[in-house]
Amino acid sequence: MTIFAKDKLIAYGQLMRLDKPIGTLLLLWPTLWALYLAEKAMPTLSVLAIFICGVFLMRSAGCVINDYADRHIDGKVKRTSLRPLSTGRATPREAKWLFIVLVFCSFLLVLCLNLYTIGLSVIAVILAFIYPFMKRYTHLPQFFLGAAFGWSIPMAYGATIEALPLECWLLFIANLSWTVAYDTQYAMVDRDDDLRIGVKSTAILFAQYDNKIIALLQIITLIFLFSVGYLSQLNNRYFIVLAIAGLFFVYQCRLTKNRDRASCFNAFLNNNYFGLTVFIAVLFGI
């Protein structure tokens, strides 16, 4: 079977999670927040297109390297047992090359930006590469994911104003807290399997306090987003819509209350609407 056979292309698409766009959206929203907040207006179409394409490529690359890192354990977890590397529909060598191609394409995009952003992109690649391996060594892999998913924020500021002001880092921390919260919800789905095979996560670390800590992280997210709005001198419409966005967190807390797998997964998916609503808040506020 050639690497371009139909079955292989389908497997590569699944490695890149083309059939599951939620991760791309969760990475896209904070990127858009940062681009619009840095400019206090709509960014140029070229910069916007570069970042949207970059989000897609780097999220895809992250999924590929994640499956490569987990290739020996995915088959032992119900949710991931049918992934291409677990079933043999793609090989580890193919996954490595796919990761390299995706990162290379991302780098070509970054070369269209300024040197400031090119330098920041090196950190983005390092974070994307190391995150999948952290679940073997620490119960805090979600924090590494938060850093990886949030690094588009300083890159967005770098690409537009070539500076990283305080509000950039406050937005980064807000996104970090949000990412840890929603990825803990995601990890709660696999907690029983992860305990059995020895994989670490914040869902395991937080144990019976998981819902309380998720709620705390969500409160921190909102506090920092309010702070960003204040420092960026956004108008009152931003704060009103942001308060509405907070209602999604209340709904998620109700979903995860009983720790049912399906409900935890639905809470995770609901974060897309939170990200979208915050973006609307930014649009109304600038």
Swiss-Prot record:
Q: Which GO terms describe its biological process?
A: ubiquinone biosynthetic process
- Identify the metabolic or biological route this protein is part of: Cofactor biosynthesis; ubiquinone biosynthesis
Gene Ontology terms: cellular component = plasma membrane
The subcellular location is: Cell inner membrane
Q: What is its main location?
A: membrane
Q: What class of enzyme is it?
A: transferase
Give the protein's function: Catalyzes the prenylation of para-hydroxybenzoate (PHB) with an all-trans polyprenyl group. Mediates the second step in the final reaction sequence of ubiquinone-8 (UQ-8) biosynthesis, which is the condensation of the polyisoprenoid side chain with PHB, generating the first membrane-bound Q intermediate 3-octaprenyl-4-hydroxybenzoate.
Protein name, please? Answer: 4-hydroxybenzoate octaprenyltransferase
